Amino acid sequence: GIILIFSATSCFNGPIVKGSKNYITKKENLEHFNDISMSGSANIIYQQDSSSRIEIYGSDNIVELLETKVNGETLNIKFKKNVNIIDKGKLEIKVFSPDLNGLTLNGSGGILFANGIHTEGDLKVTINGSGNLGGSTFDTGHLAIAIHGSGDVRLKQIDSKTCSASISGSGNITLDGMTGAAKYNISGSGNIKAADLE
């Protein structure tokens, strides 16, 4: 038993960080992006807006560990490597942009759409892990949702030209609203509830 404890703790090479609870708000204007990729266990509130920017509220020593960078058309959000965060405290990430066509969650993070999405283009949502996503009012071209793992997606008031949803694993997808055509695929023990998607 003791050997297992030592071998487990030795996996963390970097420092152990606990939130200071000295809360600050960091605001940053961003280059244009229409795709978000987040890795980790943080939660995001996304809001469609005229400008591209991010606001992070949290403990000062946790906020400084969060890396946000636009590469091409993608905003990447992740914690710095080799840091073991044991207690973040409150952490709220607000992301704003004029348009959004892609979203990828890697890990156990979550995203809430504050005012939905209105786009003439498509919206592709991918969850790798146990992340969760929710919101209402999705006015899009093709809406594509894919879960690889045990993620959870709940979207309401959909108005899309077409819609596809797929699960590899034990995830759950719940959809309601309207679409021109829908296609579903499940590999594993996942569940897609789309009876209210007409």
Segments predicted by a language model, with ranges:
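Short acidic/polar N-terminal linker immediately downstream of export determinants
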Residues: 1, 6-63, 74-96, 111-113
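Intrinsically disordered, low-complexity segments
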Residues: 5-8, 166-168, 185-187
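Beta-strand-rich solenoid/repeat architectures in extracellular/passenger domains
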Residues: 11, 104-105
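Short "repeat-start/strand-capping" segments in structured domains, especially the N-termini
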Residues: 28-36, 48-53, 70-72, 96-103, ...
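Structured surface interface patches that mediate subunit assembly and partner/cofactor docking
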Residues: 66-67
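Periodic glycine anchor positions in long extracellular repeat architectures
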Residues: 107-109, 129-131, 149-151, 169-171, ...
